[in-house]
């Protein structure tokens, strides 16, 4: 009895595609951000000191209020950043649609431009987009989202509320000698990552344009 012929079988190796983002730069960015946030939060003032009623008094004049705000901003800067961030987070979580739109916009900038490998073109629906076209599309999308939707007004109102809370608190807290004797470290704490993050983003943009 004749054996049936053996059918040829071809083993195709799976082609592994490149990651959609530049993984080393992506990890470096978030590692630096996480480290800066931890260092900044470790330098925050005790919250009980922030709400100590014995250190609060009405300012005698506008000049006195501005002087207090300036000194308290240097002393409570990490706490104030946390307060403004909480106000922003509360506003966004109370408007889920705006939160999703903002997350989508930030994700577009990160995954499609900032952390995408420069040698990997962006292909959408079979069409290849250059870096300049991608940047233009993201800039236009940002303008539309910020100025033509409720996201921009929501962020602006939340920032104004947060800044108002900070200014009122700073105007009513009387700085003591501890405030005046303490030297403010340059680029320390929670705000230090802003310069590095801005530099990294600027370098990524300038390298593509």
Swiss-Prot record:
One Pfam family of this chain: PRA1
Membrane-protein topology: Multi-pass membrane protein
InterPro entries in UniProt: Prenylated_rab_accept_PRA1
TM segment ranges: 73-93, 95-115, 133-153, 154-174, 185-205
Modified residues (N-acetylalanine): 2
Highest taxon above the source species: Eukaryota
Any single GO BP term: vesicle-mediated transport
GO CC field: cytosol; endoplasmic reticulum; endosome membrane; Golgi apparatus; Golgi trans cisterna
UniProtKB keywords: Acetylation, Endosome, Membrane, Transmembrane, Transmembrane helix, Transport
Localisation: Endosome membrane
Subunit structure as annotated in this protein's UniProt entry: Can form homodimer. Interacts with PRA1B2, PRA1B3, PRA1B4, PRA1B5, PRA1B6 and PRA1E.
Annotated family: Belongs to the PRA1 family.
Role, per record: May be involved in both secretory and endocytic intracellular trafficking in the endosomal/prevacuolar compartments.
Name of the protein in its database record: PRA1 family protein B1
High-level lineage: Eukaryota, Viridiplantae, Streptophyta, Embryophyta, Tracheophyta
